From Swiss-Prot:
InterPro entries according to UniProt: Luc7-rel
A cellular-component GO term for this protein: U1 snRNP
Protein name listed in UniProt: Luc7-like protein 3
Subcellular locations according to the entry: Nucleus speckle
Annotated crosslink Glycyl lysine isopeptide (Lys-Gly) (interchain with G-Cter in SUMO1) location: 424
Lineage: Eukaryota, Metazoa, Chordata, Craniata, Vertebrata
Swiss-Prot/TrEMBL GO biological process terms: mRNA splice site recognition; RNA splicing
Family: Belongs to the Luc7 family.
Coiled coil stretches, renumbered: 124-181
Positions carrying Phosphoserine: 3, 110, 115, 420, 425, 431
Glycyl lysine isopeptide (Lys-Gly) (interchain with G-Cter in SUMO2), cross-linked positions: 424
Native source species: Homo sapiens
Superkingdom of the organism of origin: Eukaryota
Basic and acidic residues bias (residue ranges): 234-287, 302-311, 368-414, 421-432
Amino acid sequence: MISAAQLLDELMGRDRNLAPDEKRSNVRWDHESVCKYYLCGFCPAELFTNTRSDLGPCEKIHDENLRKQYEKSSRFMKVGYERDFLRYLQSLLAEVERRIRRGHARLALSQNQQSSGAAGPTGKNEEKIQVLTDKIDVLLQQIEELGSEGKVEEAQGMMKLVEQLKEERELLRSTTSTIESFAAQEKQMEVCEVCGAFLIVGDAQSRVDDHLMGKQHMGYAKIKATVEELKEKLRKRTEEPDRDERLKKEKQEREEREKEREREREERERKRRREEEEREKERARDRERRKRSRSRSRHSSRTSDRRCSRSRDHKRSRSRERRRSRSRDRRRSRSHDRSERKHRSRSRDRRRSKSRDRKSYKHRSKSRDREQDRKSKEKEKRGSDDKKSSVKSGSREKQSEDTNTESKESDTKNEVNGTSEDIKSEGDTQSN
């Protein structure tokens, strides 16, 4: 009844008995009441119904729509149903493999027993037959000897014994042939490598076809094919994550290598920068040393220049002083000369003036004498003579004043000329 209900569920659905107004049950493919083996392909319980390998009915839901939903879902072959299905099928194959091995062992054991059982009795029978043959030959020789001697009764008794031995020998020979025929019949059995059933070698083709089309043989053949297919699928599925993992790992390794190269480049750049900074610092120190050396040399040169300039200035000042002293001496000599000249000119002028004065005095004294003479002589003409004498004395005084003025002007010109010569000599000294 359960298998019939499941068949009806597969054909008409689990809600076949519900009324139109009743709510239908929405079962997902991941529900525990759903057969996960059926979702993966087929349920093994459906393969061996009414066979020696019958697994019994499956009480879980077998729904084609649920299997389609599972195949379309994003969790297809990711939940682990396929691995469970593969393990279950491998357990069934392990069971049938054990059955096949037991069948092969049974055939081997029976063949060994048959071969050992046939070889043992046959060998013994052959030995017995050989012994009986030897006895028969010996008895026949004795019978011939007894017959030649005329012992007929003894010969007849021995002939009966020979007949009995021959019958026993024939019985042993017939037994050996029967055992060999039975052993030949047992060797024609074999074991099916798919389902483990015993087959007769050289059996009719119809019986062979019936076996190949049977549920048990087809079920195990399907299980073997499904196991190989699942192994291939799972291998590919495992290779894809492995490949993805490998690609991811390779990508990470490349990134690590790139990071390592970047770190190495940065380290080289930092090292180069440090070296450049060190070189720049060294250059700066060199420049500073050169600058200091230049400043020291410049300072020393300046000091030497100052010394030289001071010495030159001192020399120049000394030469200038000498020149100035010389110019002063010259000026002094010139001034002295001028003063001498002035003094001489003045003395000359004084002498001249004195001489003039003397002359004028003499002249005046003479004039006074004459005037006195005139006064004395010409007392009568005093008025007119006085006028004339006054006019003459005024003209003489004017001439003396003009003479004094000319002498003063000549002295002034001489002083101006001496001053200009002194200024010119000082200019020449400064230019030198």
